[in-house]
């Protein structure tokens, strides 16, 4: 006891740590032996141990189950078989197969040269070139292959490699040396590592790698987003070594061994929290320009993606901020790597409603990794995190009556705020903030994945938000507009059905007969008065009714609304609302676009109702013929208009202000303008407005002209129409506030949702059209019909679409997505063709001649208006 008291605290602590380390090493060794016994056996065919794979009665299990069982056997100190000499472990065989040539060369090298670089515990650029030169002179690359295999398969060694600073801390080096001493000749399976990890406590885990944070006191201080790895050096090394095919195989095999251990470290050991430099290994591996090659796609890259997905959110954010500083070519290379893996896995498997692509771990992991590259592309682009619309609007009024759930004491299940991606929160940047990414957003869309994705199942996973099921709607950048529109359709329909069920149950509870639909009965000649008055009453009394399915009825007409009547309703409303004579919007002849009239006499309520109509069109999957500049959709999503937006909405003014900014002379002397501008009211009378206080007395100079341009742009796009647009946006959000619209779509895609595609590809329409009632693609009337349609002018083609589908715009994805049906409607007759716009069905009699067919068809599409029952 006296002797123990004389020991210094440092010696005592050192001995305790050493004893603890030896105890853990012994435990880990036993667990690995149990795992090996369960997965490969002892080699004795007559073995009687029920916990040995060589026993004839042993029931086989997968690696994860074996890992858990190994831990249980360790705890009860179960029997261990003696190894049989005739048995060779699978892992050893794999190692020999993958590195057989290397092992033979190693023996020769040791005999011939006696130098194997076993003392290399981490790599630098200089050390790589030294070994490479040695191998080149001896014409034997085995030493370098072994070094690459050893360093690139060890997380601890790779983390220390290619540092910007030459020196490493004593704790790091000591930990790495201990790791090498304890390391077996064969790499252990990932599951065994996981079992050992579950047994170790957090204190033991932290001593496994050493306290790197203390060691950093000896090296240069780094900022929160800085990394210690020398990226340029890594690129030079890869450039030199990857040209050698033997060395490339070494990198490939090392990555196969590295990835499961990294996944284990991140899942169970919280390794990044203890050592942020752990991120270095992901940076190093991702610099390998051959990751997209076929050799990596089968095993190495999927394993690495699974490991990379385990990075905590903070680490992902740091990695994204680093990658955002890369060039567009570097971002594209990484993007193509993950896209290649996703495409390869999609086309090499058969996915359907039973075998979902969502269940493929490699595709899911690659999509999550691709998300990091996507955000790096966003952050590294032209980003504007300012100019956000201040959310100072009054809250949307709730219904004055209790819902069924509230009567029963529950909240409504669907009443959630818009979803926000955690990475956006971590980075402080949204996709909406990016004006121009490093590479285009379209390059991140994976069409083969979209083709096999079961959107109904994916939407379910998106709404449930379970950890077991992955939804690709959480990675909207990888989906095309058609797929996302289908997801939005499911969301809207489910919400409609939910409102319908709630209404029925509410009626039973209250004893009142309520309408399960949003029913609008309008007169065709007074459509604005009837529709807007009715919508205004609903918005004031019970805004939740706006989320019911729309049902339109034209007074005096027999049409039943299965979608087609609603389409015409929206078409007529839009024509009336955007009539310049009403004065709510101004029309620019040059751009063919509408803008809010700052001098409009209409009330805020009228603009709110216009927003409701726009929201209802999206909610009910109807296309509108509206022509807004892109800044309107950006403002709807929450961004204010800036000078750059003027180029689209007010091109003449934009060019004038641009010339002012680029003027090389003296602005004050030559132009003599101030911070006071002139606008015209509804009657053409001039109105003066000061952009700053006493603006008429402040001259514009070369120094303050940028401020003038920004203030002028802000006035035109924001302040002058603030009252009108705020009401418009409020009405839009009354319908879409609980929708994933903002989460899934960019402003450009919102415009596509509302307006449809401007490209009318009638060739695609012909290829996808189906036939019924006796017609086929080869029927004479059908061939003549398409010859006539293709000869139509653009205006006639739009009239034809209006006649058959209820709208003259192509849906999202183009006319090929329309699924039109042409059905035979009797023999030759004088009757005109008719249509079911709800179902995109054209009823076409079998006319006797092509001339008669054209005459009847033109008359039908030119004078078609109104609905009747056939």
Curated annotation (Swiss-Prot):
CDD domains: HECTc. Keywords: Biological rhythms, Cytoplasm, Metal-binding, Nucleus, Phosphoprotein, Proteasome, Transferase, Ubl conjugation pathway, Zinc, Zinc-finger. Pfam families: AZUL, HECT. A zinc finger (C4-type) spans 42-81. Residues 542-870 form the HECT domain. Residues 171-223 are annotated as: Disordered. One of its GO terms (biological process) is rhythmic process. Gene3D superfamilies: Hect, E3 ligase catalytic domain (3.30.2410.10), Hect, E3 ligase catalytic domains (3.90.1750.10), Ubiquitin-protein ligase E3A, N-terminal zinc-binding domain (AZUL) (6.10.130.10). Disulfide bonds: none annotated. One of its GO terms (molecular function) is ubiquitin-protein transferase activity. This is Ubiquitin-protein ligase E3A. Induction: Up-regulated in response to neuronal activity. It is found in: Cytoplasm; Nucleus. Residues 208-220 have a biased composition (Polar residues). It comes from Mus musculus. The modification Phosphoserine is found at residues 8, 213. Pathway: Protein modification; protein ubiquitination. Disruption phenotype: Mice with maternal deficiency display autism spectrum disorders, characterized by motor dysfunction, inducible seizures and a context-dependent learning deficit. Long-term potentiation (LTP) is severely impaired despite normal baseline synaptic transmission and neuroanatomy. The cytoplasmic abundance of p53/TP53 is increased in postmitotic neurons. Accumulation of ARC protein in neurons, resulting in the excessive internalization of AMPA receptors (AMPARs) at synapses and impaired synaptic function.
């Amino acid at each position: 006891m006296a002797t123990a008291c004389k020991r210094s605290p440092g010696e005592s602590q050192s001995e305790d740590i050493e004893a603890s380390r030896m105890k853990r090493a012994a435990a880990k060794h036993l667990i690995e032996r149990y795992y090996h016994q369960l997965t490969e056996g002892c080699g004795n065919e007559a073995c009687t141990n029920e916990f040995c794979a060589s026993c004839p009665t042993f029931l086989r299990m997968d690696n994860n189950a074996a890992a858990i069982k190994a831990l249980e056997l360790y705890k009860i100190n179960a029997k261990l078989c003696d190894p049989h000499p005739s048995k060779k472990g699978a892992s050893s065989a794999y190692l020999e197969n993958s590195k057989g040539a290397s092992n033979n060369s190693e023996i020769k090298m040791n005999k011939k040269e006696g130098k194997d670089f076993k003392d290399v515990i981490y790599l630098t650029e200089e050390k790589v070139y030294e070994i490479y030169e040695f191998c080149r002179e001896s014409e034997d690359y085995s030493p370098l292959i072994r070094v690459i295999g050893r360093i690139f398969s060890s997380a601890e060694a790779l983390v220390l490699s290619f540092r910007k600073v030459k020196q490493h801390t004593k704790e790091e080096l000591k930990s790495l040396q201990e790791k090498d001493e304890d390391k077996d000749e064969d790499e252990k399976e990932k599951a065994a590592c996981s079992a050992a990890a579950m047994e170790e406590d957090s204190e033991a885990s932290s001593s496994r790698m050493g306290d790197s944070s203390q060691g950093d006191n000896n090296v240069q201080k780094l900022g929160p987003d800085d990394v210690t790895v020398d990226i340029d050096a890594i690129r030079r090394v890869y450039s030199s070594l990857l040209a050698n095919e033997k060395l490339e195989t070494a990198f490939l095999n090392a990555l196969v061994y590295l990835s499961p251990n990294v996944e284990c470290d991140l899942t169970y050991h919280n390794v990044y929290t203890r050592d942020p430099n752990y991120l270095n290994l992901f940076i190093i591996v991702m610099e390998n320009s051959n990751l997209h090659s076929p050799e990596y796609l089968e095993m190495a890259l999927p394993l690495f993606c699974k490991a990379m997905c385990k990075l905590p959110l903070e680490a992902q954010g740091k990695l994204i901020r680093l990658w955002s500083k890369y060039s567009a070519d570097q971002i594209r290379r990484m993007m193509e790597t993950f896209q290649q893996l996703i495409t390869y896995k999609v086309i090499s498997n058969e996915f359907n409603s039973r075998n979902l692509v969502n269940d493929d771990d490699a595709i899911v992991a690659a999509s999550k990794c691709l998300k990091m590259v996507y955000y790096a592309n966003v952050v590294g682009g032209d980003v504007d995190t300012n100019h956000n619309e201040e959310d100072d609007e009054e809250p949307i009024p709730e219904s004055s009556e209790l819902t069924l759930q509230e009567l029963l004491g529950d909240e409504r299940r669907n009443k959630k705020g818009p979803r926000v991606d955690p990475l956006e929160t971590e980075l402080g940047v949204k996709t909406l903030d990016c004006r121009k990414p490093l590479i285009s957003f379209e390059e991140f869309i994976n069409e083969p994945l979209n083709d096999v994705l079961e959107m109904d199942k994916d939407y379910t996973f998106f709404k449930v938000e379970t950890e077991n099921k992955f939804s690709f709607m959480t990675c909207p950048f990888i989906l095309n507009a058609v797929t996302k529109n289908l997801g939005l359709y499911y969301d809207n329909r489910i919400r409609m059905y939910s409102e319908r069920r709630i209404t029925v149950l509410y009626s039973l509870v209250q004893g009142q007969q309520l309408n399960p639909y949003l029913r609008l009965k309008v007169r065709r000649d007074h459509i604005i008065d009837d529709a807007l008055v009715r919508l205004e009453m609903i918005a004031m009394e019970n805004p939740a009714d706006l989320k019911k399915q729309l049902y339109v009825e034209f007074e005096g007409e027999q049409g039943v609304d299965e979608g087609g009547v609603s389409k015409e309703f929206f078409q007529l409303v839009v024509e009336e609302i955007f009539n310049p004579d009403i004065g709510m919007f101004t029309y620019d002849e040059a751009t063919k676009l509408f803008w809010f009239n700052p001098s409009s006499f209409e009330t805020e309520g009228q603009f709110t109702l216009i927003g409701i109509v726009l929201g209802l069109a999206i909610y009910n999957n109807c296309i509108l013929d509206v022509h807004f500049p892109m800044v309107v959709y950006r403002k709807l999503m929450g961004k204010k208009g800036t000078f750059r937006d003027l180029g689209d909405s007010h091109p003449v003014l934009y060019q004038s202000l641009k010339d002012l900014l680029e003027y090389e002379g003296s602005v004050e002397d030559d132009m003599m303008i101030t911070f006071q501008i002139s606008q015209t009211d509804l009657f053409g009378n001039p109105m003066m407005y000061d952009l700053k206080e006493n603006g008429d007395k402040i001259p514009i100079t070369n120094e303050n002209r940028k401020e003038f341009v920004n203030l002028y742009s802000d006035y035109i796009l924001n302040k002058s129409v603030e009252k009108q647009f705020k009401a418009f946006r409020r009405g839009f959000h009354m319908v879409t506030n609980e929708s994933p619209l903002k989460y899934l779509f960019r402003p450009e895609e919102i415009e596509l949702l509302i307006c449809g595609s401007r490209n009318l590809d009638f060739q695609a329409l012909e290829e996808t059209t189906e036939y019924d009632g006796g017609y086929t693609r080869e029927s004479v009337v059908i061939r003549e019909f398409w010859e006539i349609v293709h000869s139509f002018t653009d205006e006639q083609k739009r009239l034809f679409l209006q006649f058959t589908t209820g709208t003259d715009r192509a849906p999202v994805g183009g006319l090929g997505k329309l699924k039109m049906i042409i059905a035979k409607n009797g023999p030759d007759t004088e009757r005109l063709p008719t249509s079911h716009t709800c179902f995109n069905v054209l009823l076409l009699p079998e006319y006797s001649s092509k001339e008669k067919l054209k005459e009847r068809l033109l008359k039908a599409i030119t004078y078609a208006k109104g609905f009747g029952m056939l």
